Amino acid sequence: MSEVVNKRHFDAFNGDADGICALIQLRRADPKESILVTGVKRDINLLKRIDSKAGEAVTALDIAFEKNSADAARILESGASIFYVDHHNPGDIPEHDALEAHINTAPDTCTSLIVDRLLNGQYRAWAVTAAFGDNLTEVAQSLAQQSGYSAEETELLQKLGVCINYNGYGSSLDDLFYHPAELYQLMDAFDTPFDFVDALPEVFETLANGYATDMASASALAPIRKTETAATFMLPDEQWARRVSGVYGNDLANKSPARAHAVITEKADGAYQVSVRAPLTNKSGADELVKQFPTGGGRKGAAGINVLPKDQLDAFIEAFEAQYS
């Protein structure tokens, strides 16, 4: 009996809206006592933190398999099983009886939408929230309409998705309003986002107010370079800028859907962090662009570079403008 009790379950999930909402859906459908493994949005090498043993289980959500492949192999070698759901380029996925992978890299899906399909829409409102957070606005609105949500309900899901996503950005957990594990635990008690907002309005208000303030600061900045097809913005090394770097890129894309956008944030060490958004009218190329740089990764429509050395800034801007010329 003690052996069964000691078998641990690990839930490793991206700290953004997609990762959090994917796990909420799964744990509402299949509650488990688990060890939560998460961090800021760009902290995706989460499997390296898991020291599993035979018979244990890992759920991995919204973290690129390619970036975690060595640790996935180590976990499988230990005799543990992995349930993997993601929408980033996975690289090579090994054949293994203990690995169940649901990976779809289509630009109009996200991890929470994949989970939604696996659960036959059981917790649809959380999936819609995540899709809005990932800036899949048309997909989210269509799904909300199919599900019978009112315009007011849909607007609430959109605002919440954007705010949860906003909370995940930062160079460290100190930049965030809520640790992603804490935010997950606050929301996981509720079948729907509507119930969550009704019960804990102060959490939503904290994020919404922070988002509005930070976005106002970002909106005051002019692009450092701008063409018909691409615009580059530079944000300072300040907490508000680190928090807003990704959602600001989404906002720019929504306002100018035919243009690509790069949001470059200065780091304390002199390097840069980069967020790239492909044009919404042609969601492609962002992943190929950032992979030209050592710490780049992401999806066709949205990608980033964790550390861009100062001496590569001009090369990045040239490559960015060439990609979207």
Segments and roles (model prediction):
Residues 2-3, 168-180, 199-212, 243-250:
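Short N-terminal helix-initiation segments at or just after the protein's N-terminus
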Residues 8, 161-164, 199, 206:
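Alpha-helical structural elements
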Residues 102-106, 186-233:
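Oxyanion-binding "anion nests"
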Residues 144-191:
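Loop-centered beta-sheet repeat module
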